[in-house]
Amino acid sequence: MRIIVCENYQSLSKKAAQIIGSQMILKPNSVLGLATGSTPIGMYKNLIKMYEEGLIDFSKITTFNLDEYYNLPAENNQSYHYFMYDNLFNHININKENVHIPNGMAQDIDNECLHYDKMIDNSSGIDIQVLGIGNNAHIGFNEPTINFNKGTHVVTLDESTRKANARFFSSLEEVPTKAITMGTGSIFKSKKILLLASGKNKAEAIYNTVHGKVTPEVPSSILQFHQDVILILDKEAAYLLSKDDYEVVQEVSKVK
């Protein structure tokens, strides 16, 4: 596990985009696993900027998103489908046929989950999977006590997760209670994993990810067993770690 600590969120976002961009240049038809939430927004802004400057090309890229709320239409402005188009896909030259997001409105939800994993396998697998992390160490929507072997599935959201996401809705009652998520078994198949974390509220989860016991109670702890994981943190998210744990990135870049 490689750990990179950046001065602030702007530097974290730039570093994450550089790693994704390097993967795209090295392999123009890369398969990217993408995440939602507030943490990767800065990375997406940097990727858009790199695209506009002609540094990267999305025309042959395939993407798979980690998760989507269950029973929330794609056109709802709080759906992850809407989020991804608003924050990335509408601003780049990606082929929309190569964009994959779980269908939260599927009539046969179990079949949708199986189909999603099959599409990932048929794509030759995810080259680099972007993850955020919850305060309770969830990755995707894999909540504590998750079965580590699970593929894509429907999950009942932890109350702490719903409260954390309530800021995006008018009230807690509007936050969906279920979601479709790639399971830790699906995530673990990715060739490389890039986990981003910003803020002191993520520090305990990060410490347990790196130094804690590998247990379903800490879903992200399974990453200790993956062959190629990079954690990109800002100083606040890293403050419980020892300086011997990580390398430091000094540069700061603001996205206008």
State the predicted function of each range.
Residues 46-57, 80-82, 144-153, 214:
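A glycine- and small-aliphatic-rich helix-loop capping segment at beta-alpha/alpha-beta transitions
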Residues 30, 38-39, 43, 118-144:
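A glycine-rich beta-strand to alpha-helix segment
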Residues 56-128, 245, 250-256:
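Ligand-binding beta-strand-loop-alpha-helix segment within the catalytic cores
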Residues 136, 140-184:
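Class I SAM-dependent methyltransferase SAM-binding "motif I" and its flanking Rossmann-like core
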Residues 33-37, 65, 102-103, 130-133, ...:
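Short beta-strand segments
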Residues 1-32:
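N-terminal glycine-/serine-/threonine-rich phosphate-binding loop
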Residues 189-256:
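ATP/nucleoside-binding phosphotransfer catalytic cores, i.e., glycine-rich phosphate-binding loops
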Residues 26-52:
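Glycine-rich N-terminal segment of FAD-binding domains in flavoprotein oxidoreductases
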